[in-house]
Amino acid sequence: MHKHFIIFLLLTISFSIGIKDVYAQKTDTLFHTNGNILTGEVKKFTKGLLYFKMDGMGTIKVENEEIKSLISNKFLRILTKHNKVYYGDIDSSNNWGEVEVGLLDERDVIKVNDIIEIFPINNTFWLRLNGRMDLGADYSKANSMLRINGSGQVNYQKEKWGWQFKYNNHDSWQQTDSLLHTAKTDFILSTEYLLSPKWRVTGTAGRSSNTELGLQARWYTVLSLQNYLVQTNRATLDYTMGLSASLERSTTGTLQNNYELVFGTDMDIFKYQSPDISITFFAQVLPNLKTKGRWRFDSGFDARIEIFSDFYLSGKVYYQYDSMPIGEDGQTTDYSFATGVGYSFN
C-alpha cells in the first residue's frame, strides 16, 4: 500500500471528524408531506435527496417527492432543471410543493420537483468540504497473488468555483520465480467554473503511472469544456471536449512530450431508497496530435451500495488502451476489477 494513500486516509478522517458539528446552526425548517415539521440544518440537496441534519437524529435523507416546503435563511446556490441558477435564501410559498428563492429584490417561485441541486455557500472552510474514500484487498493462493486497491476524493465548493482532489491506486504482487510487482496510480487536482447549470469550464493537473503499459509517470494538464445533456434527480450525463499537454517517462527512462485532444463522457445513475445505490461510468478518447497514429482510451466503472449510514461496499473496473505505449516492454491494454469498503462524508 502506498504511503500516499495512508496520508490521504488520515487527513480525510481528520477532516470528516472536524466538520461533524462545528459551526452547525440548526435553524432551517422542513415541511414533510406526512405532516411533520422538522427543524434542523440543510446540508445539501443533490440527486433527488435532501440531506437534513437534526439534533439527536443525525443527518436524515428526504426524497424530493416528500418535501412540501422548505425554509432556510442561509446563502444558497440553487440549480433547476430549466437551466436556471439562483443565489440567496429559500422560503415557503403560498402553495405546497413550491418555494420562493433568491435575494430580497430578485425572487422567484419554483417547484420543489424542478430543483436539481441546493448547495449552501458556507463562510467556513470545513463546511465546504465533502468526499469519500475506500479500500480493498484480496489474496489468491492458487497463483500466489496479493492485490490492494485504494481511492479517495475531497471536494471543495464555493459560489461558482469548485475544486477536487482524487487519488487512485491498484497494486498487485505475485510470487513466481521472483516477486513481480505491478502498479497503477493516479493523482488528480481539478478546478471548475460554473458558467450555467449545464456548462462548466474545467482545468486539470495530474500525475499517473501504469507499469503494465510501461509508463513510469505521466505529468499532464487539461483545459476542457463540459456540457450536461441529462441532469435530473435520478441521473446525469455529460460530454467533455478539451486539449491536453503532457510529459511521459517510460519504465526504461525514455522521455516524450505530447499534445492530445480530449473527448469524454460521464454518466451517473443513482437510487436513494434503502439501500442507497449509485453507479458511475466515464470514458475518454485521446487522439495524439504529435505522434501520428497514436491514440489512447481510458474508462472506468464504479458501483456503490450502502451497508449502513455513510459506509458502503464498492466494485470498480478500469480499462486502459494505448495504441503506441512509450515503454518498449509496455502492453497496449490494462484492466482490473476490484472490490472494497468505503466511507463518505459531507
PLM segments and residue spans:
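Compositionally biased alpha-helical segments
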Residues: 23-157, 164-168, 186
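Transmembrane beta-barrel strands of outer-membrane/channel proteins
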Residues: 133-139, 152, 165-171, 191, ...
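Repeated loop/turn-to-beta-strand initiation elements of outer-membrane beta-barrel proteins
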Residues: 159-165, 198-201, 232-237, 270-279, ...
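Outer-membrane beta-barrel "beta-signal"
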Residues: 333-346
